[in-house]
Each structure stands twice: as structure tokens, then as C-alpha cells.
Amino acid sequence: MDINSLAHTKWNCKYHIVFAPKYRRKVAYGKMKQDIADIANILSMLCKRKSVEIVEAEICPDHVHMLVKIPPSLSVSSFVGYLKGKSTLMIFERHANLKYKYGNRHFWCRGYYVDTVGKNAKKIQEYIQNQLQNDLEYD
């Protein structure tokens, strides 16, 4: 078990987070598919800024799965708000044409899914790794 620490705290807080682009548009499709690495780099950089470790992540055509370790000093909702808000600004800065499809400041949909991860972390990690393949099979 991976135990992290803060000044007076030992912690192991893992969360499975799923969020989607506005209107559930297939962003990781066609021309934007080449820019998946760019979106992944943006999300990774923003996580590092908040000391959040990405255990596993997958960007599917119409949603994103992330298994992350969030320190207890940071609430899940504030982290997801930060991640979606800042990544929107950075994505629109690099891909200005998307502003017309999504509106000026709304790349991601309003909500998200979050689940705590306990002893089943390996199973969730496998699920995220296989998610892209499963999505392609159903399309």
C-alpha cells in the first residue's frame, strides 16, 4: 500500500474521476485525435501543480477517466473545478477553433463522476486501461 505524508498526516486517498466534454462531443476523434497527447499533457501538468498523482488515465473519444491520488489538504470538488477550468483555458488557447463549437469558456460539461478507491484499486486501474478498447467495440 502506498502511503503518502504531509506534515502531521499519513494518507492514501485515491479517486476514480470521470468527466466529459460539453454535449459529450467526441473530441478525441478525427483531427483532434492527434492532439490527445496535448490534452493529456495539460491534465498532467495541472495535476502536478496541485501535487496530485495520476495513477492511471485514459482519454476516450467522449470522456476522460482518471485514477488519482489527491492529498487530504485539497477537496475533490475544488481539484476537479481547478482541473476542468484551467484545462479549458489552456485547450482554447492552443485550439482556438474549438471556442466556436463549445462556447467561449465551456469545454467540459458541468458535472463529473467521482468514486473513492479502496482495496479495489488494481481492478479500477485495469478498467481504465481497457476503457478505450471497450468504447471502440461498442461504437
Where do the protein language model's features map onto the residues?
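Charge-rich, low-complexity N-terminal segments
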Residues: 1-139
